[in-house]
């Protein structure tokens, strides 16, 4: 009996230690914060991003608003693959409230990237689809390729129209602005132009031509820093 009690006590201590270790690991893993989001816990990320978003709206901090929406979009997709439609609508809604040119440009650019991502993710669903003449369906899942091209083109054109010489470093909370980035994309207008001319986002060739001509006119030496 004494041997049995000794075994039981030892095993009990082992279990307590094991349980403590499990809770410690869970606690460390779940320490997601807005500053350091852990996307393994998407609901925590969304919770923290929502709180930061509300505060940023009150403070008029557009870069933090964009960062919060970017985090929410990524986290929501890991929970529901079809959440991108909701994320796009949310980005457009918050972007419509902004007043400064640089904020409007950055939000339009991000919205364009999300539309482009949705088209790429669901391109097989729209293969061979052609919408009739008239207004586009409210549900983007019913759009064809041309509808996405038109919307992305419009958003990029608006972004370029309002993009100004605001330092990109002011958007470092949402856009990585290291030394290399600051050298090649010193201003918001440079960043927006580069995204349009890189060709990763679907849009009309005429927009590419327009932006390139205006960039070259602004830089008589022949190129912007990021075009070298």
Task: Enumerate the predicted regions with their spans.
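Boundary at the C-terminal end of the N-terminal hydrophobic targeting segment
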Residues: 28-32
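Bacterial N-terminal signal peptides
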Residues: 13-27
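N-terminal secretory signal peptides that target proteins for export/translocation
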Residues: 1-12
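Extracytoplasmic/secretory-pathway proteins
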Residues: 37-228
């Amino acid at each position: 009996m004494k041997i049995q009690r000794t075994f039981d006590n030892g095993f009990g201590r082992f279990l307590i230690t094991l349980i403590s270790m499990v809770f410690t690991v869970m606690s460390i893993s779940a320490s997601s914060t807005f500053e350091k989001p852990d996307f393994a816990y998407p609901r925590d990320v969304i919770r923290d991003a929502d709180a930061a978003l509300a505060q940023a709206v009150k403070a008029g901090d557009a870069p933090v608003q964009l960062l919060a929406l970017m985090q929410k979009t990524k986290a929501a997709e890991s929970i529901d693959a079809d959440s991108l439609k909701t994320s796009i609508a949310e980005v457009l809604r918050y972007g419509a409230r902004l007043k400064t040119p640089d904020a409007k440009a950055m939000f339009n650019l991000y919205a364009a990237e999300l539309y482009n991502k949705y088209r790429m993710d669901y391109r097989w669903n729209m293969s061979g689809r052609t919408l009739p003449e008239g207004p586009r369906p409210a549900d983007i899942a019913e759009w064809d390729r041309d509808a996405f091209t038109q919307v992305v083109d419009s958003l990029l054109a608006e972004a370029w129209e309002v993009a100004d010489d605001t330092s990109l470093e002011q958007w470092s909370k949402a856009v990585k602005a290291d030394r290399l980035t600051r050298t090649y994309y010193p201003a918001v207008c440079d960043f927006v132009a580069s995204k349009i001319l890189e060709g990763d986002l679907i849009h009309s060739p005429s927009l590419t031509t327009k932006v390139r001509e205006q960039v070259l006119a602004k830089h008589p030496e022949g190129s912007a820093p990021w075009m070298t």
